């Protein structure tokens, strides 16, 4: 029998770093996450992502794979090699929003 445990987690305690070079993707994710009461930081490239990961210490990084200059795999590799950021979970994404 499972004990009855009521655990309430406030999403506002968690910060998500959204990294994507496509503005519509960033806006969609920001709206979805803020509606769920997460704190959201957005950046548009890998260099900014590396800087914000160190400075803001997000709880999660949503990272686009297909970005110019430094792709998501390169960013993830650098984050995992850095002792200051290696603990942060990363979700790599291939989001393409079609607007008609």
Specify the residue positions occupied by each region the protein language model found:
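Two-component/phosphorelay signaling modules centered on CheY-like receiver
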Residues: 23-41, 47, 55
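Receiver (REC) domain active-site loop signature in two-component systems and cognate sites
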Residues: 67
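Conserved small/polar residues in nucleotide/adenosyl-binding loops
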Residues: 95-100
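Non-catalytic signal-transmission and effector/linker regions of two-component phosphorelay proteins
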Residues: 1-17, 30
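Active-site residues of response regulator receiver
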Residues: 20, 64
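His-Asp phosphorelay/catalytic-motif detector in bacterial-type signaling
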Residues: 13, 57-59, 84-89
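Acidic catalytic/metal-coordinating carboxylates
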Residues: 24, 44-48, 71-77
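Short amphipathic alpha-helix used as the core "switch/output" element in two-component signaling
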Residues: 51, 73-86
């Amino acid at each position: 029998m499972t004990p009855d445990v009521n655990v309430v987690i406030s999403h506002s305690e968690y910060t998500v770093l959204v990294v994507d070079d496509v503005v519509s993707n960033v806006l969609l994710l920001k709206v979805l996450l803020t509606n769920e009461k997460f704190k959201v930081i957005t950046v548009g490239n890998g260099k900014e992502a590396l800087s914000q990961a160190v400075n803001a210490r997000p709880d999660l990084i949503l990272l686009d794979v297909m970005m110019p200059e430094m792709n998501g795999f390169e960013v993830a590799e650098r984050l995992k090699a850095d002792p200051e950021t290696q603990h942060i979970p990363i979700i790599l994404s291939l989001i393409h929003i079609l607007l008609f």
